Amino acid sequence: MKVSDRRKFEKANFDEFESALNNKNDLVHCPSITLFESIPTEVRSFYEDEKSGLIKVVKFRTGAMDRKRSFEKIVVSVMVGKNVQKFLTFVEDEPDFQGGPIPSKYLIPKKINLMVYTLFQVHTLKFNRKDYDTLSLFYLNRGYYNELSFRVLERCHEIASARPNDSSTMRTFTDFVSGAPIVRSLQKSTIRRYGYNLAPHMFLLLHVDELSIFSAYQASLPGEKKVDTERLKRDLCPRKPIEIKYFSQICNDMMNKKDRLGDVLATAQRIRRRYNKNSSSEPRLKTLDGLTSERWIQWLGLESDYHCSFSSTRNAEDVVAGEAASSDHHQKISRVTRKRPREPKSTNDILVAGQKLFGSSFEFRDLHQLRLCHEIYMADTPSVAVQAPPGYGKTELFHLPLIALASKGDVKYVSFLFVPYTVLLANCMIRLSRCGCLNVAPVRNFIEEGCDGVTDLYVGIYDDLASTNFTDRIAAWENIVECTFRTNNVKLGYLIVDEFHNFETEVYRQSQFGGITNLDFDAFEKAIFLSGTAPEAVADAALQRIGLTGLAKKSMDINELKRSEDLSRGLSSYPTRMFNLIKEKSEVPLGHVHKIWKKVESQPEEALKLLLALFEIEPESKAIVVASTTNEVEELACSWRKYFRVVWIHGKLGAAEKVSRTKEFVTDGSMRVLIGTKLVTEGIDIKQLMMVIMLDNRLNIIELIQGVGRLRDGGLCYLLSRKNSWAARNRKGELPPIKEGCITEQVREFYGLESKKGKKGQHVGCCGSRTDLSADTVELIERMDRLAEKQATASMSIVALPSSFQESNSSDRCRKYCSSDEDSDTCIHGSANASTNATTNSSTNATTTASTNVRTSATTTASINVRTSATTTESTNSSTNATTTASTNVRTSATTTASINVRTSATTTESTNSNTSATTTESTDSNTSATTTESTDSNTSATTTASTNSSTNATTTASTNSSTNATTTESTNASAKEDANKDGNAEDNRFHPVTDINKESYKRKGSQMVLLERKKLKAQFPNTSENMNVLQFLGFRSDEIKHLFLYGIDIYFCPEGVFTQYGLCKGCQKMFELCVCWAGQKVSYRRMAWEALAVERMLRNDEEYKEYLEDIEPYHGDPVGYLKFFSVKRGEIYSQIQRNYAWYLAITRRRETISVLDSTRGKQGSQVFRMSGRQIKELYYKVWSNLRESKTEVLQYFLNWDEKKCREEWEAKDDTVFVEALEKVGVFQRLRSMTSAGLQGPQYVKLQFSRHHRQLRSRYELSLGMHLRDQLALGVTPSKVPHWTAFLSMLIGLFYNKTFRQKLEYLLEQISEVWLLPHWVDLANVEVLAADNTRVPLYMLMVAVHKELDSDDVPDGRFDIILLCRDSSREVGE
């Protein structure tokens, strides 16, 4: 005997072990004493597991002092003969069972014994190992039987509720012990609670034909006594009253109104007595067991899922004859199989899944996304790895196939998704369960209760994937499913691992991933590994670390998908196929995010400045701050709570707390900032996120990309480092920190892309470049810059962060700004002001009579002072610092006689001053610097009459006021501007001046008139809380909107000066205090206004639209007013669009065929309309071949046939360089000066090359393969067809080519004018029938007509004659 772990045993007898290998008995007792460790251990029993080849041993520590800890788990390898076997011991106390424990292949014996005792209330039943294996299924799949129990109780409740007075129903639902009706006690609210108690009984009755309960129970009775019904009732019935009630009621309704399982067993025993004289009674008894199970399946309504294949009409003689012929003394019972039609997979399944998830207008982002979805769903490749940039839509790559699998009726697929961190769990489950397409549950449910038969996808973290319980359940999947669901049509689907690069890069967690190597990967249909930061080297190492072969040696191109027929080796030994979308697209990721690297003195102070500025500009936005340590996370959270609502997360929190906090931040719109370590940068999808700030000095390139990738739709990312401290040393095995310099170049180097250092297009969203940024991001940058300039001009700076942290949340403080209609920045709430209370008047100095002073420091008689510091008689001062007689001062700092001052700083006689800084007559108030007469002053600071007050810069009554240059008589000017603190801390105002600016966003909610206007607008435009567009507002149907939708229309569509004022509210273009936007509004009034302007453009030609812009000049700065003006004509505009665009919808939506032969003018006036489809295609390819050879600028050529050269355009490898080349040669500037493009904003045409036309781009790229086949069919030399950017340049040039447009509309009679670029692009992609009835895209016909206009075949002046004839015919027709 050789011991692998070199332990020495004092005494060991392995003869019994060796004999056990050949022993056929279920239970083998071994009396030997083996010292596995220092405590003597008695081996009670052991057996060989046929599947795993392990010998499983149950042992008991005879010398243990604590019997509850007497068992422990240990695996020891010993040499038995020539074979090495492993002995496994169970971790449990000695079971309370007379016959001794029998080990199970699935779980420890104590749970089985507990279940037997719960069901039968006895200790004397002796089952064989098969019974234990069957009983153990309950614990492995408890969730499934819980769901069945809920269904049973719901059915009972429905029956009782439908027939409450029926006597038979009352008997059925009657407690057999007390005889009292129990219908009233069964309520919907208690069904789930009672269902858990009922689940073991449901399991037992469904599997009654697989257990030896009947025969074993009789054998356990003493002496000659056989069946005793009362004994059965005592032994077999549950003891709890609640269990008695519901268990008896369902048994009553199932077995001919008989009570409980005891009567079922009594019936079985009577049948046994009938055949007691020969052994053939046993098979008959087994048949009854099958019948019992079948009845239960029928009663539960599971016939649609299960079909009992055995016959219920077999007689005893047939059974005896069959038994005699069988060598086995047990008859084989036919399995219950699932009866469902087979449904093959189809590529259309993915499209249907997308429409279920996103609506009928669903289209793929691009060709790569479509092919990858088909690869995952249709191909036989067992293991797939995908690298795609953050925000690309990696989730949909497996989400759509999972929905397609769930729609299949023949097989139930159960898939698993694992993410690296707990904080992603809640976010993933919310995203994947939307629209109800998938049933999603935590993987913990599967580990604890097993498969419930309902869930399609279980979601967990890497620790769950590595756990022993999970790997054991997957290893026993086939046996569990066959015994539980009685079918083999419940299969393991996909194993999906998100952000799998962590297996290699997370050095400190690699020891936790060791258990993954024990997972049976071959049990899954397919393994899918996803990441945004896993180049080939990282991906290969990560896959090998978890026990897979790694990547295929040959890197696979997504355009060369090949199917492998040799899959016999299994998933774990098969190389993983890698699809690198970043290399395929050759575009550097994250170009849509503006990345700024700043070195600052204090990272927290700079971060706070940026956050406050962001929330001043975008009050509803969110931000993420990444800190380097857990202590820093908590310190920042405590410090910033007084400014905005904060959620903080780090690794020391519990799993449930992480999930709860993440869900709160994602779903609660009032939460502003998420602070955490790097675990918050992976996988979280937050729609309102507009800023990411990173304070980690050890940030590596993967963490940077993951953090920036949270900004899905653009935004700002700041990397803040302390001066002279960025160079941080990386820990062993980790990636080095990022270096100073261009971030884009480091991203290119990481992904293995071509370096552009020192070349055009090097900077993409970094180093000040804004070329690739969206319009919203550019506008956000500009507004942040302007706000920073204002702060610098005002010399507002931040002092040091406070050393003590307050735990109270300052959200209440923010609510104060939002809730009060009378709040003012100059109010003082329960505090004393120590700095400039009761100071002098600023702005202008004037003496006025019968005038209106705005923002002035003045002495006035019979006037109205608005926002002034003034001395007034018989006047009303609103929001001013004034001295007044017989007046009412609201929100003012005033000197008053016989007046009521509300929240003002005032000088008063016979008045009441509340929350004010006041100057009064003949009295002195300590601690407030105020003088009053017959008045009450609270929390004030003021200047008085005939006195000089400290802490103020004012003197009164026949005096001269310093710093104001104002002359007053018997009056006091006080508190022109106060530094006020709402919470009694005067230092807060000096801490961060931006806080005062931040309050402006809340002041806009203060006016009653504004609130009233806001409510009116919300009622007039109710759908702005959803993703509504102006076409929905007009009343168009969704199928019409799909083709009329205004792709590419944004704020740059508006001419300069129209809805583009800066320094105002971004949503409504009003001053912040007059803002009419409301919380939860997803579509701004400004956006609806520019879409409404685009709708008006749809109905007008160039001259008419230019006149229209002049007519709406009063609304150029008022999008809300324009919307009201537009909505008045809502019905008229709808009818006009339906009338003018009926032809367009017929072609694009209903796909009516356009035939060139149907156009009489076309056949007579153009040779193109007499050409075949083959000739049109040849001409199209020839035009592009000539353009490519001559390096002609495409847009300019199709605009006016100018063959100007632009080599950079043809050599550009991405869209950014292409657009830069066009801008360099002045194409966009010439286009605006020569065409109607000047009626739009200066950036409108340029931005069409960004992300506006994704769906059309995807459709065009899908057609590239067709073009290649056409060239081969035509017999021409295959040439490169234009890529999307060049193709779009062609369409833009044709759209603004007025001469070409006029001729095309004249020749092709089926079309008319379209005045929006997106409609023109959509129209160009429809198909037309050429003269030989072959289909060609309309854009090919357009190029042919354009070429004909440029040729010498058209006589000079011929086209003008044609247009003249057309205009004449129109006049005659009209």
UniProtKB/Swiss-Prot annotation:
Gene3D superfamilies: P-loop containing nucleotide triphosphate hydrolases (3.40.50.300)
Keyword Glycoprotein: no
Molecular-function GO term, any one: ATP hydrolysis activity
Domain Helicase ATP-binding: 375-552
Residues where ATP binds: 388-395
Listed Low complexity bias regions: 832-975
Protein name per the record: Y' element ATP-dependent helicase YML133C
Bias type Basic and acidic residues, positions: 976-999
Function: Catalyzes DNA unwinding and is involved in telomerase-independent telomere maintenance.
Location of region: Disordered: 832-999
Enzyme class: isomerase
Organism, scientific name: Saccharomyces cerevisiae (strain ATCC 204508 / S288c) (Baker's yeast)
Single GO BP term: telomere maintenance via recombination
